[in-house]
Amino acid sequence: MFDRRLLQYFDWGLLALASIIGGIGLFTLYSAVTAETPEPQKIIFYKQLIWFSAALFAMTVSFSINYKLLDRWGQVLYIGCILLLVWVLFFGKYVGGSRRWLILGPVSVQPSELAKIAVMIVLARYYSKDANTRGHTLRELFRPAVLTLIPFFLIVRQPDLGTAGLLLLIAGSITLFVKIERRSLIYLMVSGAAVVPLVWFFLKEYQKRRILVFLDPDLDPLGAGYHIIQSKIAIGSGMISGKGFLQGTQNALSFLPEEHTDFIFSVLAEEWGFIGSVVLVLLFLLLIFWGLKIAQGCREPFGTILAVGITSMIFWQVIINIGMTMGLMPVVGVPLPLVSYGGSSVLTTAIGIGLLMNVSMRRFMLE
């Protein structure tokens, strides 16, 4: 139940930051699906408005309940998420060569998005109860590794390498934060470096092509490299101040693929230029800094680790998505938080921000 005393500690700054980024996202999405596009395409924008309304409700719930209840129910949430990931492999909606979505009446959801929150909670639960100032050994890291790898492999099977890789980055960020024994860290780094080249042999052909065209888009300029080339043209053509709202030609002439999801940053960069791009990046950096300050000010380990996990989720999504659009990273289908179209992504981010607010408010409460 919501404690009314917490209202005096409500984090209005965090809410304002998230609202501004979300507002920029809606304006950019409107442009992406409106400029010289057929009327049916505009329904994407109206769907996103509905998802934002649902996200507002989800955020309200997530900051209203005591986040410490997640410590108690974390395992149940995790198991439920694993069951959903198994279910989607057999009964999920098959789109574009992957099976990632569960159909729930008129809407579809991605359990892999919810898996990010579930893994954060169980890792925060484990590390908060197994504090180790000298650093965790390989033996102590075995259980959190298993908790991470189970959903990881289920997501890889869909296949969705972008979300699976993001899950590893979030888990890795949390684990580095709680500290790893030096010898164990060196062993993990060497082992990881040895395993990475072997991953190539397990990739599907289209995944290999994405990596190759990331290294040289001109290898397939009309195929796998087309996305990156057109995205870089859009970003570069925006120059300093951009072409103006609804004036982006790459988007309007349908040169830019996936303009409302993976490459929405390219739409923003073309219309608002370098200045608009920097403003959005600075807003994200401020949001990340805000999350880390909340983690630093928390008085107990579970809340601290949870805040670090949520902040790392936002950080890595921003890095990967913007990196994709600029040709600095392979195209792996990771959305830009609160900007890209996608109900599951918006809900997950809203829940995460709500939990950050939760930790922020309750850190001031006297024990």
Regions found by a protein language model. Name each.
Residues 1-18:
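N-terminal membrane topogenic signal
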Residues 15-31, 35-227, 266-326, 351-355:
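Hydrophobic alpha-helical transmembrane segments of multi-pass inner membrane proteins, especially
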Residues 105-115, 157-159, 239-243, 334-348:
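Glycine/serine-rich anion-binding loops at beta->alpha junctions
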Residues 1-2, 321-367:
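A juxtamembrane structural motif centered on a specific transmembrane helix
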Residues 2-4, 72, 183, 367:
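Positively charged n-region of N-terminal signal peptides that target proteins for export
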Residues 213, 217-261, 272-276:
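TM-adjacent membrane-interface loops and short helices in multi-pass inner/ER membrane proteins
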Residues 160-165, 243-248, 259-261, 278, ...:
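Transmembrane helix boundary and interhelical junction motifs in multipass membrane proteins
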